[in-house]
Amino acid sequence: AGVHASMMVAHFDWPADHEGEGCEEMPLDCTQLTYKLNRLLPPDVAVQAVRPVGPEMHARFSATRRTYHYYIHTRKDPFLRGYSWQVNVPLDFALMNEAAQVLLEYSDFTSFSKTGTDVKTNICQLTEARWEQLKPGEWRFTVSANRFLRNMVRAIVGTLVEVGRHRMTISQMRHAIEAKDRQRAGESVPGHALYLTNIEY
């Protein structure tokens, strides 16, 4: 989908030594490993650091909070191509911010989940959802939660854009969320303007 990440965490199991004493007995040179991984990876992927953690650590399931940013620009700028979504119609960002706050009142985001996904629950605890203007014609949406569903942020932004275009009222957005029906929410926006920016453990 062309989604970016300025912060992404992965984990791996470091092999035990020959005596089976565990990875703590086998020295791990994090600096050297970072260097060697970056030599192998393509130019658009970089390892910032390698850190030892306990055996219970899981990059996905141990996370307690994640933050995404979505960028929109409303005037043509070739330098933003591939990194921000150009919207060529007027948007009411004040109304979109009002709608974003409504999201914090809900926890079941079935209406924003890609259909057919194999997840046990569509419950997510949102703690932040807001638009801010970075400079004239450039806006950023920030959303944080303990977990996200597949395609959830892009569907949320698409719905907020519908509100910003005055094609959906906040009341209609509420009904769409409460219907728990993907068809009732807005279309998913392009992935190239979406960034995973922070993960907390």
How would you label these PLM feature ranges?
Residues 1-201:
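Structured-RNA-binding interfaces characteristic of tRNA pseudouridine synthases
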